[in-house]
Amino acid sequence: MDIAPEDKGENVRREICLTLEQMGIRPECSHHEQGPGQNEIDFRYAEPVKAADDAVTFRTVVNTVALRNGLAADFSPKPLRSEPGNGMHINLSARSSTGKDIMPQVIAGILSHIADMTAFLNTTPASYQRFGSYKAPRYISWSSENRSQLIRIPAAEGEYRRAELRSPDPICNPYIAYTLLIYAGLDGIRRRAELPASADINFYTASEEVRSQYKTLPATLADAKAAAKTSEFIASSLPRTVVEYYTK
């Protein structure tokens, strides 16, 4: 991983962050990522619609600043087959007006519907080449232990207590993605869904015997589309025309 002064993207990231701040989006951290020319910028949480607006604005700013510096930004999920892919980790929090801890039910709801949602979170064949390596999840699981999980629970409390969904990639439509996550979480609350036991293992090093105990995300885009087409949850959450467009 490049570090200053060898990190050639440092000045570009700084320019992106300053531009975002001028547009009312608050960057929280930026750094070189694991792959060559790969960079990460995290920005502050917001209510769902604002968060989706921020995600779209972010992509526009990155593309514009990159072009201004003679570069091209690539948000595709797997730009280089033998290198880490690009993810769009979604951090989400939910609070009850009564003070009850509803996060376990929200996470359980998302886990129960994630396979049906995947066609909308990972929309290209290359999306599925990313799963299962370089910190990208393959198994439907949660834990606070490591980054091989589908849902990671960061060590944070108070307003920063959250769940991090690690499967989506940056070319998904954030409005659709957030809609599905909200409906899945609400379904978990409505059903009082029970959160399965945490998977406190590293799936990248675990034995096949251990990994076989867990369900996986769809292996291909065709598998993901097939799951979405027959899903009552998807049919009840999105307009029919949207479902048909993403599953054709």
PLM feature spans:
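Glycine-rich, acidic/polar active-site loops that bind/position phosphate-bearing ligands
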Residues: M1-K248
